[in-house]
A protein has these predicted regions:
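Short, glycine/polar-rich helix-capping loops at beta-to-alpha or helix-loop-helix junctions
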Residues: 113, 190-197, 263-268
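C-terminal capping/lid region of NAD(P)-dependent oxidoreductase domains
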Residues: 224, 254, 260-261, 265, ...
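A structural motif shared across PLP-dependent enzymes of the aminotransferase-like
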Residues: 80, 108-121
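Glycine-rich cofactor phosphate-binding loops and adjacent beta1-alpha1 units
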Residues: 155, 200-280
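Glycine-rich beta-strand-centered segment in the early N-terminal region that forms part
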Residues: 20-35, 47-108
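Residue-level marker of beta-strand positions
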Residues: 103-104, 114, 160, 179, ...
Length: 350
């Protein structure tokens, strides 16, 4: 049996593993499809994550250095790549009552030929409805962050909405914003293929930020008013600067991205100072979230799963390219790390 592992920073390989016996609360799944996470996972893959040498302390709500003798947060050679898997249950533990051998399921897990997942009181292990799309299923994770970004920005009927960065999260945010009643939805991304997909799924306009004054173009498209809401998923300083420039007075920026360090030159004066901008940092898995207790992570997940399985969201075009598991190391290094412009969310077939 093989699994996809980061053996060194920016190096992926298939590594042999021995299957272990499942515990009473677990199921073993033979994986048929999967997908990695193109955002935070690739930061880890590049050894650029703060979690390597630091840990986020829940009591202090801040990062703190790991003790010198403590394991690092990411250990290359052990770091398994992948985020979501779809497959069939081939073994059930004795305490498992909600699943059976043969069930087709989707869950969080790494890209490996088999995965073992807790199946007792685990709502995150989802049964696949008959005839449902695996491509929609592996978008379960990005859909949650897209939906929280839209909700935290309080998108309302008639709003002018901009989505910056048209990866999987941004593409799903486009669909959600349009279906929430936004009158104008604008996508921002330099990659023409991503813009084409966004237009097919709800974007009224798409802007290429390279060599353009995106903020002014947003104002032009909205009759000089600017955007009521800008959902920022790219994590780049220039994107946030443009968002502050294109935002309507009193508008909201929903900051979904796990940002890169900002270089010198980012300016919170200028339009940010004059336009009463509000920036909300949106993260679906940080609880309690802004609408707690009515909305919890569980409710977000259950809503996203329903929207993915009933076809309200369409992620077929987002899973591109699709590679075989045998070619997944090369695919991961090319499409996820080295040339992310060639993909939106890479799919893997087994």
């Amino acid at each position: 049996m093989k699994k996809l592992v980061a053996t060194a920073p920016r190096v992926a390989a298939l590594v042999e593993y021995e299957e272990r016996a499942i515990l009473a609360n677990e199921v073993k799944i033979r994986v048929r499809f999967g997908a990695p996470k193109h955002g935070t996972e690739v930061v880890d893959f590049r050894a650029a994550s703060p979690f390597i040498d630091e840990d986020f302390n829940g009591e202090w709500q801040m990062f703190s250095p790991r003790p010198a003798n403590a394991p690092r947060g990411i250990e290359f050679g052990k770091f398994q790549l992948g985020n979501m898997v779809v497959g069939d249950i081939i073994e059930c533990g004795s305490d498992v009552n909600d699943y059976a051998v043969g069930d087709s399921v989707c869950g969080y897990g790494p890209l490996s030929e088999t995965v073992i997942i807790n199946a007792v009181n685990n709502y995150k292990l989802r049964k696949m409805p008959q005839g449902s799309s695996w491509k929609n299923a592996v978008c379960y994770d990005p859909a949650q962050f897209a939906m929280s970004g839209v909700r935290d920005a309080n998108v309302r009927v008639g709003d002018f909405v901009v989505v910056v960065g048209l990866g999987a999260i941004g593409q799903i945010a486009i669909q959600l914003a349009k279906r929430a009643g936004a009158s104008v939805v604008i996508g921002v991304d330099p990659i023409a293929h991503r813009c084409d997909i966004a237009r097919r799924h709800g974007a009224d306009f798409c802007l290429n930020p390279i060599g353009a004054d995106v903020g002014k173009e947003i104002k032009t498209l909205t009759g000089k008013q600017g955007a009521d809401v800008i959902i920022e998923t790219s994590g780049y300083a220039d994107a946030l600067q443009s968002a502050l420039r294109g935002l309507a007075y009193g508008g909201t920026i929903s900051y979904v991205a796990f940002a890169k360090p900002f270089a010198e030159g980012f300016n919170l004066g200028r339009e940010a100072h004059f336009n009463n901008a509000k920036i909300v940092f949106s993260r679906a898995c940080s609880e309690p979230n802004p609408d707690y207790p009515r909305w919890s992570r569980k409710r977000i997940e259950e809503t996203c799963w329903e929207l993915l399985m009933n076809g309200y969201l369409n992620c077929e075009d987002l899973i591109d390219p699709v590679v075989t598991f045998a070619n997944s190391p090369e695919g991961y290094m090319q499409y996820v790390d080295q040339h992310p412009e060639q993909s939106i969310k890479m799919g893997v077939t087994f």
